[in-house]
Every structure is written in structure tokens, then in C-alpha cells.
């Protein structure tokens, strides 16, 4: 009984930032972005109506993290969350439809993140997008939309919540002078969430970065070139990570967090036999930190 995958993310953005984020996802990352009547931007990486949604709002913030669960596990996981002293609210049909979900249960954690346990509604395939992104359920396992690195006040308590309540496993730990991060998995993706204590100038409740995974190295290289061509800031140059072996770069998104686009992430074939790793550097090569251009 555990979360299956990171199914969707909802961000609120100021109007000017929302338009800039559309450029990030559509013109740099290569996703499909559709607009609805309310001015929201729906970012598609596969056939689901959205994997990332950008809602107009007064501030830039992560509004909801959608955790996909099996229908048979929803009530039990929600009960476990309640036992961990978090109040769980069953969303009505209108909110579930807004999330393109069959059922949704919400709770907020101590760092201010809103989590949504949801049962997926059926959606069509999209062969074009599915040829571009590692997302959702693939032939070799479940991967979800990508991974999220967040800043938390009490890392040990938060890690325990993810592992003991939501059913995640510890992938590895990377410790270097600037940060100390724990990486957690819930499926074949090396990590779906990573937890950091306050570091790198970030405070609890903030997002360090969102990672999306391309299916070709060329996609990453083209996106890296597009960042520069379109005048956005590179946060870290192309490099390869030590723990999940991803080839990637990071750009600084206008919404106040980084977006990583990677290729070739390590796959966890057998969750039961995974051995936790420990690393003293986040990258094997590259990923050189860049000063903002403006």
C-alpha cells in the first residue's frame, strides 16, 4: 500500500510570470500547453489533460501536489495520514473533475505544502508526447511526471512521513558542503521526491526544482540551447548526476524555482532489492553553477 506516482502539480503564478512559464514548458521543454477559459495553462506530457497546471494567482507558489494511488488504497492511505495527525478532507466531485481525477482527498503538511491523494480518471494515449517524455506508466515501469525537490523544516520527520505513511523508500543520500539531501522513490523512477533542510538560501515550504525527463539526449541539448536563445537564465550547465546518473541541465524559472530537464535516469527494477547509496558530491561532471545574467 503506497503512492503509485507523482501525477500532477498545480502552481499559482502572477499573470506576467504565467506567460513566461508557458514559454518555459512549451518552447524550451517541448511540452504541449493548452489554455482554458479561465486563463489557466495546462501542460501536457502525455495523454492526461494536464501533468502541470499554471493557475493565475496573486503570488507564485506551488498550490497542490497530486499523488496518484490505486482506488483500493485510497481510503487506507488517507486513514494512515489521519493517524499521523494530519487532517484529511474528501474533495467534492467538482474539485475532483477540476483535477481530471475520479476521487481526491486533500491534506496540508507542516511546511505548508498541499497534498492531494487521487484516483486517476481514464485518459487517451498521445503517441507523440509519449515518444518525447518519460511520464506516467511506461513499458518498463511506473515513473510519474518527474521529481520534485523541496525544502522542509524537519527532514527526519518528513522523511518518516513519506516512508512510513505514504510508502516511499529511501534511494540514497547526497551530502556535500552546500547541502545534504535525501532522495525517495515510490516506483521505478530513481527518486520522485527529495528532501532538503534549509540550504542554498531556501526556506521551508519552498521548491528547489522540478525535474522532467526526456527520452533523448538531443532533446536536452536542444532545450539547453533554447534557454540561451530565448534569454532565460541557466542555473547549472549540462552535467551528469552521481546518484541517478541523469544527464541534465537546470534553468531558473520565472516562478522562483529551477526546472531540470534530464535524460537517462537510473531505473529501479526491483524495489525490494534496492540498496541505499551514499554520495559526497551531487554530480560526476558538469552542472557548473551560473550567475544570473540579469
Swiss-Prot record:
Its EC number is 1.13.11.-. Its cofactor is Fe(2+). Pathway: Xenobiotic degradation; dibenzo-p-dioxin degradation; 2-hydroxymuconate and catechol from dibenzo-p-dioxin: step 2/3; Xenobiotic degradation; dibenzofuran degradation; 2-hydroxy-2,4-pentadienoate and salicylate from dibenzofuran: step 2/3. Fe cation binds at residues 147, 209, 260. InterPro entries: Glyas_Bleomycin-R_OHBP_Dase, Glyas_Fos-R_dOase_dom, VOC, Xdiol_ring_cleave_dOase_1/2. It is an enzyme of class 1 (oxidoreductase). The keyword DNA-binding does not apply. Keywords: Aromatic hydrocarbons catabolism, Dioxygenase, Iron, Metal-binding, Oxidoreductase, Repeat. Responsible for meta-cleavage of the first aromatic ring of 2,2',3-trihydroxybiphenyl and 2,3-dihydroxybiphenyl. 2,2',3-trihydroxydiphenyl ether, catechol, 3-methylcatechol, and 4-methylcatechol are oxidized less efficiently and 3,4-dihydroxybiphenyl is oxidized considerably less efficiently. Monomer. Belongs to the extradiol ring-cleavage dioxygenase family. This is 2,2',3-trihydroxybiphenyl dioxygenase. The gene is dbfB.
Amino acid at each position: 500500500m503506497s503512492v503509485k506516482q507523482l501525477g500532477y502539480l498545480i502552481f499559482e503564478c502572477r499573470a506576467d510570470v504565467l506567460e513566461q512559464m508557458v514559454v518555459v514548458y512549451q518552447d524550451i521543454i517541448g511540452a504541449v500547453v493548452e489554455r482554458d477559459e479561465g486563463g489557466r495553462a495546462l501542460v501536457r506530457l502525455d495523454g492526461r489533460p494536464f501533468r502541470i497546471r499554471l493557475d493565475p494567482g496573486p503570488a507564485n507558489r506551488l498550490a497542490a501536489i497530486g499523488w496518484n494511488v490505486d482506488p483500493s488504497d485510497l481510503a487506507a492511505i488517507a486513514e494512515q495520514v489521519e493517524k499521523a495527525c494530519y487532517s484529511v478532507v474528501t474533495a467534492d466531485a467538482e474539485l475532483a473533475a477540476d483535477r481530471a481525477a475520479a476521487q481526491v482527498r486533500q491534506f496540508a503538511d507542516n511546511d505548508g505544502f498541499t497534498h492531494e491523494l487521487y484516483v486517476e480518471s481514464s485518459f487517451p494515449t498521445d503517441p507523440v508526447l509519449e515518444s518525447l517524455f518519460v511520464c506516467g506508466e511506461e513499458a518498463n515501469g511506473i515513473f510519474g511526471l518527474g521529481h520534485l525537490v523541496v525544502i522542509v523544516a524537519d527532514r527526519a520527520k518528513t522523511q518518516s512521513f513519506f516512508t512510513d505513511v505514504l510508502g516511499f523508500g529511501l534511494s540514497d543520500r547526497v551530502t556535500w558542503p552546500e547541502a545534504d539531501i535525501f532522495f525517495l522513490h515510490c516506483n521505478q523512477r530513481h527518486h520522485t521526491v527529495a528532501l532538503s533542510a534549509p540550504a542554498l538560501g531556501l526556506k521551508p515550504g519552498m521548491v528547489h526544482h522540478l525535474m522532467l525527463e526526456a527520452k533523448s539526449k538531443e532533446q536536452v541539448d536542444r532545450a539547453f540551447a533554447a534557454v540561451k536563445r530565448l534569454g532565460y537564465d541557466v542555473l547549472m550547465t549540462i552535467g551528469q548526476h552521481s546518484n541517478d546518473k541523469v544527464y541534465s541541465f537546470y534553468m531558473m524559472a520565472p516562478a522562483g524555482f529551477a526546472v531540470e530537464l534530464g535524460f537517462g535516469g537510473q531505473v529501479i527494477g526491483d524495489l525490494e532489492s534496492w540498496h541505499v547509496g551514499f554520495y559526497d558530491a551531487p554530480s560526476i561532471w558538469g552542472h557548473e553553477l551560473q550567475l544570473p545574467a540579469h
